[in-house]
Amino acid sequence: MASMSLFELTRGFADIPSALANISILDLVLDSRQVTEGSGFIAVQGTQTDGRRFIADALDRGASLVLAESPDGKISDSRVIGMPGLKKHLGELAKRFYGDPSRQLALLAVTGTNGKTSISDYIGQLLRLLGESAGTIGTLGARTRSGESVASQNTTPDIISLNRQLADWVDQGIRFAAIEASSHALDQSRLDGLTLHTGIFSNLTRDHLDYHENMVAYQQAKLHLFQDFCPDRVLFNADDENTFPAREFASQSALGISLRDASADVFAQVTSEAASGLSFLLHSPYGSTSITTKVHGRFNAFNVTAAIMAVCGLGFAFSDVAAAASYLQAVDGRMQAVGGGEDVRVVVDYAHTPDALASALFTLETSCPGDLWVVFGCGGDRDSGKRTEMGRIASGLASKLVITNDNPRTEDASVIASQIASGCMPNCDGADVLIELDRAAAIVYAIKSARPGDTVLIAGKGHETYQIIGRAQHAFSDVEHARQALAARGVADV
């Protein structure tokens, strides 16, 4: 286990009493519950709780010392050290303690409203298909060379956890890592001090306005990935002008990816959206070829292309990367088919924003011979302004709507559902709308009621294995409930 003295860790940041200078630190943690013997506990004010409240707990658990922005005067212990400006130095402290791991591997970061998980996962898959070791960090947790996952509470972990994970991968010989960079993480400086090889900006559409207040602030948070880190290479969406400013901050090169403009730096021309998967012609500075994949959704042409360009930017041959793309697997909870689709086609997708819901429904509508059903809701204690918009979109593209719970948290679930339904009414065009707040019952109703040839989209939760009601998490999986409903219908999962 690596260790560092307090003097080495804080040199240049704080004046440490000589009697404490040689205290050995075995790890850094922000959560007192993770403290083990010899840990250094970092006590700072967070967005949801104040770490300084847990100084005593950290010491009881065996912390060798506590660094606190402004220590609680009630605790008189020489191991509690005040460090003004501690929070803004977290990135540098973590980088120093863990040996600056982002410089020892090629780190790629993906930001954007939609597509972060898919792009980062595709990058990891492509690298593994090419025989390389790669890790990914994001909504699906931390995944290593063989694809196994370790759950993470946030899309982008705190900067200490990030550095610890990257350092562990460096020790394992992993040479590449792709991470999701959420707007919250960028705004809260959770990536500070990292060195980026590639930055990718997928798109910007409405989301998180409960946090950012307006789209300008939301865009600025995303742009921190480029302004603050100046990646060697930048990939942006040539079809979304909100992403254009990112190209100005590339240290070496920037490429715009388009699904519409043949004159763009990179052009992905969709040629087929079949039950077997998505195909497109790819034209890029690295070469041109036809790409055939097993993934679904026109929007995935952008995601796959971004991953291909990112991996080519690491120095891999275009022909090899393009060939590997045909073996890409669908990302958990992203246009994930449940069952064989011979009777009723059932798809689970994470779509929880207006744009993502529209993209998923449009994709399924084009290949649905029968009625298109959608089971969805909107999260509580989150941007309430998108609820009516999602109702409008759903009623405009689907024939049958079942509005239900989607992590209502502390809000009244019936109020959320009514707000969604109010958006459906002016645009209903004959769509049937049912409110069933029990999400399990809603899934059963849609799958049981659908006729052969119909498609049922279960949107909003994707890979999640829980439902948040009040402040408690309850076990819940859209995929498992869909499988059970199909089994009750007499359809075996494949």
Language-model segment annotations:
Residues 1-92, 96, 241, 267-269, ...:
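N-terminal leader/targeting and accessory segments in enzymes
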Residues 1-18, 37-40, 50-53, 286, ...:
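ATP-dependent carboxylate-amine ligase
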Residues 68, 73-77, 172, 187, ...:
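Acidic, Mg2+-coordinating active-site environments of NTP-dependent enzymes
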Residues 64-70, 200, 235-238, 373-377, ...:
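Short internal beta-strands
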Residues 90-238, 244-250, 305, 367-368:
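Phosphate-binding loop of NTP-binding sites
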